[in-house]
């Protein structure tokens, strides 16, 4: 049996960044939990991170990412540099290489996807999503982005609602965090 599921989305708009995730944890064909929290604030609330994949692996990756951000002696928060450093370690370290998860990290200026294959992707649009319902949420978000009246949080929330209607591994118990 394997764990499946999760949809996480990050949106930037109007000087604000929102990250949202559904709450469903599925094991095989069974929903084990409907209110899991898959996003976290890091570095005193200045960075948002979300994960898709194994929970224990994600916690390890959150900790490693935060270490990379804090490793700069000048105190500057550079999530791009930290993401590249984490991706290098994740790909080359024998223990980290076995971790099965994907991460989204975001601050007020950047949104990044980090994968275990060493990819660090910064989207062209200020939208990115991961997980089983990621493509549904992403498509919905691109459409919602055309409505200039919607905030980053509104778009993230509405996009996850769409994904929850289509993806059996995504529910509508949404946790949303926002920073500016």
From Swiss-Prot:
Name the UniProt record assigns to this protein: ATP-dependent protease subunit HslV
Cysteine disulfide links: none
SUPFAM superfamilies noted in UniProt: N-terminal nucleophile aminohydrolases (Ntn hydrolases)
Assembly notes: A double ring-shaped homohexamer of HslV is capped on each side by a ring-shaped HslU homohexamer. The assembly of the HslU/HslV complex is dependent on binding of ATP.
A molecular function (GO) term: metal ion binding
Domain of life, per lineage: Bacteria
InterPro entries on file: ATP-dep_Prtase_HsIV_su, Ntn_hydrolases_N, Proteasome_sua/b, Proteasome_suB-type
Cellular compartment(s): Cytoplasm
One Gene Ontology term from the biological process aspect of the record: proteolysis involved in protein catabolic process
